[in-house]
């Protein structure tokens, strides 16, 4: 993509890629970062999201510095954490984890935190943390069993995907919807634009 600086997304998430594409921004490369996402003992949700986004950015930066085509590109990383109070919910991989998450979320408010970390071509780190409050309806055992059976939850923070079936569980959202999906679009695009990335480059003939 000639005519603009390159952009690397440090994620393999189809949702984050789709959100960037929705904003008319197409990364030149994906460099998913292999980072241990286990919270440290006593770690608070905000701190966890910030730490992991930075760790993903640093890991991906090492990778692109070895690539002549991508060295000096903008690098974007993000991490999403779902929490009830101070309790961080897992990125569910097991049926039991998903069931436990859903029971905990049932009929309650929870918060979704996404930390976005941008590395500029000059190597500066810029970071934003976005918080969204979400309320679920009271889930029946049939709701929980049916949703777990869908498999949609697998690998998702908090054991659900708001852009899928679980969207029907949501009573109220206060804040950014795209933040819950995994990348707060307004803040991400503002961050990129504020650091000199030509965010409107891909808008021409985007329809």
UniProtKB/Swiss-Prot annotation:
Transmembrane segments: none
InterPro entries according to UniProt: ITPase-like_fam, Maf-like
Coiled coil: none
Major location (coarse): cytoplasm
Active site annotation, chain numbering: 79
EC category name: hydrolase
Gene3D superfamilies assigned: 3.90.950.10
GO MF annotations in UniProt: dTTP diphosphatase activity; UTP diphosphatase activity
One BP term from GO: nucleotide metabolic process
UniProt cofactor(s): a divalent metal cation
Pfam family, one: Maf
Repeat listed as a keyword: no
Subcellular location: Cytoplasm
Positions bearing the site annotation: Important for substrate specificity: 15, 80, 163
GO cellular component: cytoplasm
The EC number(s) this enzyme carries: 3.6.1.9
Catalytic activity: dTTP + H2O = dTMP + diphosphate + H(+); UTP + H2O = UMP + diphosphate + H(+)
Keywords: Cytoplasm, Hydrolase, Nucleotide metabolism
Biological role: Nucleoside triphosphate pyrophosphatase that hydrolyzes dTTP and UTP. May have a dual role in cell division arrest and in preventing the incorporation of modified nucleotides into cellular nucleic acids.
PANTHER family per the UniProt record, alphabetical: BIFUNCTIONAL DTTP/UTP PYROPHOSPHATASE/METHYLTRANSFERASE PROTEIN-RELATED (PTHR43213), BIFUNCTIONAL DTTP_UTP PYROPHOSPHATASE_METHYLTRANSFERASE PROTEIN-RELATED (PTHR43213:SF5)
Recorded family membership: Belongs to the Maf family. YhdE subfamily.
Name used for this protein in its record: dTTP/UTP pyrophosphatase
Taxonomic source organism: Rhodopseudomonas palustris (strain BisB5)
């Amino acid at each position: 993509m000639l005519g603009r600086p390159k952009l690397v997304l440090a994620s393999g998430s189809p949702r984050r890629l789709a959100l960037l594409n929705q904003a008319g921004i197409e990364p030149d490369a994906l460099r998913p970062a292999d980072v241990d996402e286990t919270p440290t003992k006593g770690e608070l949700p905000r701190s966890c999201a910030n730490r992991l986004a930075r760790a993903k950015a640093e890991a991906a930066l090492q990778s692109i510095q070895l690539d002549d085509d991508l060295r000096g590109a903008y690098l974007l990383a993000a991490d999403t954490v779902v929490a009830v109070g101070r309790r961080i919910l897992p990125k569910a991989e097991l049926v039991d984890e998903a069931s436990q998450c859903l029971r905990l979320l049932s009929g309650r408010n929870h918060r979704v935190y996404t930390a976005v970390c941008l590395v500029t071509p000059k190597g500066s780190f810029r970071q934003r943390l976005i918080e969204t409050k979400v309320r679920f309806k009271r889930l029946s055992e049939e709701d929980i069993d049916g949703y777990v059976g869908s498999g949609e939850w697998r690998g998702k923070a908090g054991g659900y995907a708001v852009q899928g079936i679980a969207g029907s569980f949501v009573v109220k959202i206060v804040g950014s919807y795209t933040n819950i999906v995994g990348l707060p679009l307004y803040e991400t695009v503002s961050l990129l634009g504020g650091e000199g990335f030509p965010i409107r480059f891909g808008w021409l003939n985007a329809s």
